[in-house]
From Swiss-Prot:
Source organism, top-level taxon: Archaea
Coiled-coil zones: none
The family this protein is said to belong to: Belongs to the CRISPR system Cmr7 family.
Claim: Membrane is one of the keywords in the record: no
Protein's UniProt name: Putative CRISPR system CMR subunit Cmr7 2
Source organism phylogeny: Archaea, Thermoproteota, Thermoprotei, Sulfolobales, Sulfolobaceae
């Protein structure tokens, strides 16, 4: 996977997939992700991202078969705060957040996605990766945007709903995602 746009510096960012936040992938005829939106905020450009890094599809049924490279970070929770994603440390290894990593060339775009601009660089080895595909495609350091205060209250496991993730081909086809497949994005929250 090459750096989107060529020579600009790219940082890989962990984006948790949580309830009440939408994630829209726009896919071209060559099965490349051309645009990515998190709650309507563009993250990218993502012109060189291959669709199968994130999901496998059955084109005959216009349906997602599997999500790939789902990153899991332990000891944190995620909530939606003022239409942005807020992550906090709990230091409890039972708490976890799942999501994707995306390349970003413009860190200012992340101000519209995350409630905190406190960036922490984390080794890829600190994550569990579900359905790993294309080993070595991501940089060894991933940035996580997390608040400075630790959450010490009770947590619960939450699931995302249908239409949280939208995958649309430039031909107007929207890939269906079976409800049971969304269970891979369970996460800890308040």
């Amino acid at each position: 996977m090459s750096s989107p746009g060529g020579s600009q510096q790219v940082e890989w960012v962990f984006i948790p997939v949580i309830k009440d936040v939408t994630y829209e992938f726009k896919v071209d005829n060559n099965d490349n992700i051309t645009e990515l939106y998190v709650n309507g905020n563009k993250l990218g450009p993502a012109s060189s991202l291959e669709m199968d890094f994130y999901f496998d599809v059955d084109v005959s049924n216009n349906q997602v078969r599997k999500f790939n490279n789902v990153f899991v970070l332990f000891g944190v929770i995620a909530t939606k705060d003022s239409n942005k994603i807020k992550m906090q440390l709990t230091l409890n290894p039972c708490d976890f957040v799942r999501g994707f990593v995306f390349p970003s060339q413009d860190p200012s775009q992340l101000n519209n996605i995350f409630a905190s601009n406190n960036k922490v660089s984390v080794s890829e080895k600190a994550f569990a990766i579900l359905n790993r595909k294309k080993e070595g495609a991501v940089s060894s350091t991933i940035n996580v945007y997390i608040t400075q205060n630790t959450y010490t209250g009770n947590t619960k496991i939450e699931k995302i709903q249908q239409n949280t993730i939208i995958i649309e081909k430039n031909t107007g086809i929207v890939f269906k995602i079976p409800n049971d497949m969304l269970n891979i994005f369970r996460y800890s929250t308040t």
